[in-house]
Amino acid sequence: MPKLAAFPKGFFDAIIARRMTVFEWIDLAGRLELDGAELGPKFLDSFESGYLARVRAAAAARGLELPMLCHSPDFTQPDPSARRREVELAKDLFRVTAELGGKYCRVLSGQNRPGLDEGEALRWVIDCLWELEPHAKAAGVLMCMENHYKDNLWTYPEFAQSHRRYLAILDAVDSPWLKAQYDPSNAIVAGEDQYELLERVLPRVATMQASDRYLEGGTIDDLRDRARDPEHGYARIVKHGVIGNGLNDYDRIFSTLARSGYSGWVSIEDGEGPTVEIGMDNLRRSARFLRGQFDKHWGRRAP
């Protein structure tokens, strides 16, 4: 049976701007039917051990784990010193993840900057991940590479947004300390097949981002045409929605995961809405849907 966490997609800007604290997010997460709360490094005021212990204790007081850190490393920066800073930050974030009690740290390739040479950028990403591999192992933290769309704070979309590049990186870093974080909605945004990708990465899936998207004012073909532009940002026709109400067939996704024996974390990416109350209601509905899916495909939890 998977465990259920949530990432505060709808509250991200408020947390980054400190209109909501990480402790307030943990308190909100504790009101949902969750096993854990997902954090991002920029949610934290400090990486100092005493502060991290207080964050972990706050989660434990709400009956929550902090299983995963949603990091967005940018390994496609042409400046070697910038890539070095990204590597050193990631090393420290493995420690942060472990001190929070987590075992998973998301990694990415970086931004798809104009003018990048594909082969050279792939080598940068692969070299950075191989350098990080022994440090992840030492911390006991799995690097989980997400098939990603675009970080909220980035200018350009993900370099490895296409499945061809994403799989090339996973194949090149064939280590038990680099796993896949599967996000079906990001495959849709890339104009690719989310079910084919799942079958391809199934043996390496360690974590999953559960989100759902719907189209407003456009079609799948429009989205695929837009995905061919390597510099495109968020497509306005793609909207986040309550999980189970969008384009993903979650019965198909979870039956595939259950067949493989998957028992890792599934993290909700939702909480959109004009107010915190509406965002929380959407998170609650998404959590209820996912719990129902877990019961259906893995068997009902013991009371």
Segment roles from a protein language model:
Residues 264-290:
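C-terminal/domain-terminus segments
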Residues 13-19, 40-53, 74-81, 112-116, ...:
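Acidic-and-aromatic substrate-binding clefts and catalytic sites of carbohydrate-active enzymes
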Residues 41, 73, 109, 205, ...:
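Residues that line or immediately flank small-molecule/substrate-binding pockets and catalytic motifs
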Residues 245-259:
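A short, acidic, amphipathic alpha-helical segment used as a generic capping/interface helix at domain edges
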Residues 1-103, 120, 126-130, 137, ...:
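N-terminal pre-domain/capping segments
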Residues 106-122:
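Flexible, glycine-rich active-site loops centered on histidine and acidic residues
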Residues 3-4, 36-37, 69, 126-247, ...:
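Acidic/histidine-rich catalytic cores of soluble enzymes
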Residues 37-39, 67-69, 102-109, 142-147, ...:
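Short beta-strand segments at enzyme active-site cores
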